[in-house]
């Protein structure tokens, strides 16, 4: 499941004229850290806060051909200007891709560049033969959730307190987030659960999310 060539991503999630994707390089780490800090200050704590540390990129992220690493960071560029960032993480054992965090420069948000995040995550997953892709969406505003739903991702639940955010200067709170997934393999690759193996509450939720898929046995 090698990482794809970033040039091929433009076919799956095309950008407006004048914009392009690039893979993060070692020399761009400081600029990327500063961009996240400026565009998404809430991640100074919590699950995505690693993206504000330069050592995270040097040790964990694909850089200059180090394709064995499990984090992949895509830059959005206009000419020489950095205008957006998307970070994803692969789980080789389960063959799943997690859309970790993305951010767009406020000066370029009118072009709806973040609309490409779900498509990019899916394109990466398909090109690598992943079974599923997933990501989390904030419940503070509806925009990211709307993008996932528009592109056919499924809402499978609300996670309480999985992550923390700085909601205002000096105030850190645990947050609720929506979890969205998209399955990339055929139905035949699944072992369907037996209804007799589920509690009534589990069965009710399963039927709500995946109607007619539980085994009657």
PLM regions and their residue ranges:
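Conserved GNAT acetyl-CoA-binding A-motif
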Residues: 125-138
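Conserved catalytic-core motifs of GNAT/GCN5-like acyltransferases
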Residues: 136, 149-171
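Conserved glycine-rich acetyl-CoA-binding loop
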Residues: 81, 105-116, 128, 141
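Short acidic N-proximal helix/loop "leader" segments that mark the beginning
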Residues: 1-16
């Amino acid at each position: 499941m090698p990482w794809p060539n970033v040039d091929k991503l433009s076919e799956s999630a095309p950008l407006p004229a004048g914009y392009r994707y690039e893979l993060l390089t070692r020399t761009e780490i400081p600029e990327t850290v500063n961009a996240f800090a400026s565009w998404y200050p809430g991640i100074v704590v919590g699950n995505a806060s690693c993206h504000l540390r330069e050592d995270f990129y040097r040790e964990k992220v694909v850089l200059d051909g180090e394709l064995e690493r499990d984090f992949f960071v895509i830059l959005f560029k206009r000419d020489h200007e950095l205008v957006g960032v998307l970070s994803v993480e692969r789980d080789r054992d389960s063959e799943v891709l997690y859309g970790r965090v993305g951010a767009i420069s406020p000066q370029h948000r009118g072009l709806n560049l973040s609309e490409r995040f779900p498509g990019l995550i899916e394109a990466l997953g398909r090109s690598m033969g992943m079974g599923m892709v997933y990501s989390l969406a904030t419940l503070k505003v509806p925009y990211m959730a709307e993008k996932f739903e528009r592109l056919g991702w499924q809402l499978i639940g609300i996670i309480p307190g999985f992550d923390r955010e700085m909601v205002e200067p000096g105030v850190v709170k645990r947050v609720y987030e929506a979890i969205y997934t998209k399955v990339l393999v055929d139905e035949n690759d699944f072992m369907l659960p037996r209804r007799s193996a589920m509690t009534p509450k589990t069965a009710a939720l399963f039927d709500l999310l995946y109607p007619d898929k539980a085994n009657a046995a």
